Amino acid sequence: MGSNDPSTPSKASKPPEQEQPPATTSGTTAPVYPEWPGFQGYPAMPPHGFFPPPVAAGQAHPYMWGPQHMVPPYGTPPPPYMMYPPGTVYAHPTAPGVHPFHYPMQTNGNLEPAGAQGAAPGAAETNGKNEPGKTSGPSANGVTSNSESGSDSESEGSDANSQNDSHSKENDVNENGSAQNGVSHSSSHGTFNKPMPLVPVQSGAVIGVAGPATNLNIGMDYWGATGSSPVPAMRGKVPSGSARGEQWDERELKKQKRKLSNRESARRSRLRKQAECEELGQRAEALKSENSSLRIELDRIKKEYEELLSKNTSLKAKLGESGGGGGSDAVPDMNERGDTNGGSHQKEP
C-alpha cells in the first residue's frame, strides 16, 4: 500500500504504532474524539488548494459587539474584532485549509512543537501545496499533505502517524503554555468544542419544569412529608383537546339552558297576555250586548212615553171640550174628584 520511499520513515512503523494504545500521561490531555477518523475520510484525490485573500478586511466595526455573522465560512479568517462563544459548530470542509489564529479551532490533539511557534501560522500551507521533495509538518486537522506527485496512501499513512504522535507532543505544548495558533489550550476547550446534540421537540409537547403538587396543604406538612407523595405532581400543560371540548360542551349546555329558560319565560308571558286579551274581548262583547239590550229597552220606553204623551193630549182635548159644553157645575166636581184621587185629572168613563 503505497511506495517504499525512504523520505517517509514513519510508514515502516505504521502497523505497530496503530496497534499500541495511546500513551497516558499524568497531566491533563485534550480528549480524543472517537468519531474523528470518520471525519478524516477524504475522497481519493489530492486536496484542493487554498488561496487566502491578499487584501485584508477594511476598517473594523466601530463597536465591539457590532452585527456579525453566526459562523463564518470554514477556513475564512474572521476580522480581529469578532468574538465567538466556545462550542460553535463549523461545517466539515472537503479539504484541509488554513485556520485563523484569532480563536482556537477544534483539533484531535495534534499540535505543533514549540520550535515552530515563532513561524507564521499556515505559512507552509498558504498555497495548499509543499515544495517538491519536502514533507509537510502536521496541520491543524492532523492531515499531512505530500508533494503534488505523492499518492493517497502516503497521505493516509502520515495521518495515522500524526494522530498517534499527538499524545506525546501535547504535554510539552501544555508545559510551554502555548499552542499552535498562539492561544493556550486546556482540557476544557475539548468539552467546549464538542457539538451539542439537538433534541427533537414535539409540536404538542410543552417544555417546562414540573411544579409542586397543587393542594391546599402547601407548607403545612413540610418536615413530615415523605419522599413519595400520594398526590401526583401536576405539570403545567396546555389543556388537551378533550378538556377543551368538555369546557366547550359545558358552555354550550349553559347557553342552551339559558336559551330554553328565556324561551319558556317568553312563552308564559305571551300566554298570559293572550289570556288577558281574550278576557278583555269577552268583557267587551258582554258590554256590547248589554248596551244593545239597554238601547232596546230605552227605545221601548221612549215609545211608551210617546204613546202616553199622545193619550194625555187627547184626554186634555176631550176634557176641554167636555168642560166647555156641560156648564160650570161639572168643573168643580172634576176638581174634587181629582183632589180626592191624588191630583189626577183623568175622567172616569
Swiss-Prot record:
Subcellular location: Nucleus
GO cellular component: nucleus
Biased composition (Basic and acidic residues): 261-277, 334-349
Family named by the database record: Belongs to the bZIP family.
Role description: Binds to the hexamer motif 5'-ACGTCA-3' of histone gene promoters.
Complex formation: Binds DNA as a dimer.
Full protein name: Transcription factor HBP-1a
Organism of this sequence: Triticum aestivum (Wheat)
